[in-house]
């Protein structure tokens, strides 16, 4: 026998039946099982809800990403619209000059027309369209800034356009500012 306790072999302990946990009685066994099944069902439901929330969030983020890419030109288009307005005003002013038109004025007007035409083509190529302003007033596309009596128009019809409106795909970038006819 070895006197060194570090090298000593572990001795087997005898385990009596009294130290073993007692088996549950048959009545409480059924309730414990039902309790565990209820807990499993609760955890499964919780898992399904969390998984559904995750999938919905994933789909929403994918949709938002697609829309962000789809409408990427919207901000720059809004910034370009005042430039188009300024070119149109300059062309209108050049056309209203009275008197004899010099060759320089004619070339200037031609340059403005070409610039405005190119601008319009670029906007159209990128899906930016001018809002039509004929006929009936549409509050989704037009902004009424005044009502005027007009014997040649029916009530609610657009009489005059003060500023053109534009849309990018389905979204209105800027509503058209118009006056509409009112009844006398």
From Swiss-Prot:
<protein>
    <recommendedName>
        <fullName>Protein GrpE</fullName>
    </recommendedName>
</protein>
<keyword id="KW-0143">Chaperone</keyword>
<comment type="similarity">
    <text>Belongs to the GrpE family.</text>
</comment>
<dbReference type="Pfam" id="PF01025">
    <property type="entry name" value="GrpE"/>
</dbReference>
<feature type="region of interest" description="Disordered">
    <location>
        <begin position="1"/>
        <end position="35"/>
    </location>
</feature>
<comment type="function">
    <text>Participates actively in the response to hyperosmotic and heat shock by preventing the aggregation of stress-denatured proteins, in association with DnaK and GrpE. It is the nucleotide exchange factor for DnaK and may function as a thermosensor. Unfolded proteins bind initially to DnaJ; upon interaction with the DnaJ-bound protein, DnaK hydrolyzes its bound ATP, resulting in the formation of a stable complex. GrpE releases ADP from DnaK; ATP binding to DnaK triggers the release of the substrate protein, thus completing the reaction cycle.</text>
</comment>
<dbReference type="GO" id="GO:0006457">
    <property type="term" value="P:protein folding"/>
</dbReference>
<feature type="compositionally biased region" description="Polar residues">
    <location>
        <begin position="17"/>
        <end position="29"/>
    </location>
</feature>
<keyword id="KW-0346">Stress response</keyword>
<dbReference type="InterPro" id="IPR009012">
    <property type="entry name" value="GrpE_head"/>
</dbReference>
<dbReference type="InterPro" id="IPR013805">
    <property type="entry name" value="GrpE_coiled_coil"/>
</dbReference>
<dbReference type="GO" id="GO:0042803">
    <property type="term" value="F:protein homodimerization activity"/>
</dbReference>
<dbReference type="InterPro" id="IPR000740">
    <property type="entry name" value="GrpE"/>
</dbReference>
<comment type="subunit">
    <text>Homodimer.</text>
</comment>
<keyword id="KW-0963">Cytoplasm</keyword>
<dbReference type="GO" id="GO:0005829">
    <property type="term" value="C:cytosol"/>
</dbReference>
<dbReference type="GO" id="GO:0000774">
    <property type="term" value="F:adenyl-nucleotide exchange factor activity"/>
</dbReference>
<dbReference type="GO" id="GO:0051082">
    <property type="term" value="F:unfolded protein binding"/>
</dbReference>
<dbReference type="GO" id="GO:0051087">
    <property type="term" value="F:protein-folding chaperone binding"/>
</dbReference>
């Amino acid at each position: 026998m070895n006197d060194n306790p570090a090298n000593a072999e572990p001795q087997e302990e005898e385990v009596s039946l009294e130290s073993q946990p007692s088996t549950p009685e048959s009545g409480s066994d059924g309730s414990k099982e039902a309790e565990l099944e209820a807990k499993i069902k609760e955890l499964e439901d919780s898992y399904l809800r969390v998984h559904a929330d995750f999938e919905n969030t994933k789909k929403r983020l994918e949709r938002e990403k697609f829309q962000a890419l789809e409408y990427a030109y919207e901000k720059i288009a809004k910034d370009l619209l005042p430039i188009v307005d300024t070119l149109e005003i300059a062309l209108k002013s050049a056309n209203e000059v009275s008197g004899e038109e010099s060759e320089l004025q004619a070339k200037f007007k031609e340059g403005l027309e070409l610039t405005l035409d190119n601008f319009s083509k670029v906007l159209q190529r990128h899906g930016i369209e001018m809002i039509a302003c004929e006929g009936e007033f549409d509050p989704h596309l037009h902004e009424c800034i005044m009502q005027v009596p007009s014997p040649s128009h029916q009530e609610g019809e657009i009489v005059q356009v003060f500023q053109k409106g534009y849309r990018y795909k389905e979204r209105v970038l800027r509503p058209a500012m118009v006056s509409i006819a009112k009844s006398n």
